[in-house]
């Protein structure tokens, strides 16, 4: 179980405890991170220019499972939870997509891809 997530931005580190192990991951230009307790994952946004340009997902043991730039035409905005208590990333588009600028994207573990799950408002 992932516990005690700490973002140490000045040192570009994300740290957490998993069981008896202290996990420390280097994240250049760290912006933010959140724990997905439902799936036992750590989501991290990094490399802000000025908003984050990289999403990285780690398992509880600190192994990188997924890395992505934002979907085409969008920027990563922030991390939050959906109604299922899973971490999702909000992506913002300069031009409205189906009437909305901001959309929730979730990580599909089976397909190893981000998928748009609904408008963020």
Model regions and ranges:
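Histidine-/acidic-rich catalytic cores in large beta-rich domains
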Residues: 1-16, 57, 80, 84-88, ...
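Aromatic (tryptophan-biased) beta-strands that constitute blades/sheets of beta-rich domains
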Residues: 14-28, 63-72, 115-116
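Structural motif
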Residues: 9-14, 50-56, 97-105
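Short beta-strand elements that form the blades of beta-propeller/WD-repeat-like
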Residues: 1-9, 38-49, 85-98
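Short, structured interface segments that constitute the first stable element of a domain
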Residues: 19-56, 88-90
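Structural recognition of the beta-propeller blade-terminating site
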Residues: 58-59, 108
């Amino acid at each position: 179980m992932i516990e005690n997530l700490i973002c140490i931005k000045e040192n570009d580190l994300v740290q957490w405890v998993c069981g008896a192990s202290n996990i420390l991951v280097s994240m250049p230009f760290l912006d933010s991170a959140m724990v997905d307790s439902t799936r036992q994952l750590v989501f991290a946004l990094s490399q802000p220019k000025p908003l984050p340009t990289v999403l990285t997902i780690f398992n509880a043991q600190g192994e990188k499972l997924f890395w992505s730039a934002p979907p085409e035409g969008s920027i990563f905005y922030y991390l939050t939870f959906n109604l299922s208590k899973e971490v999702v990333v909000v992506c913002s588009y300069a031009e409205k997509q189906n009437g909305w600028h901001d959309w929730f994207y979730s990580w599909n573990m089976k397909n190893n891809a981000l998928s748009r799950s609904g408008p963020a408002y």
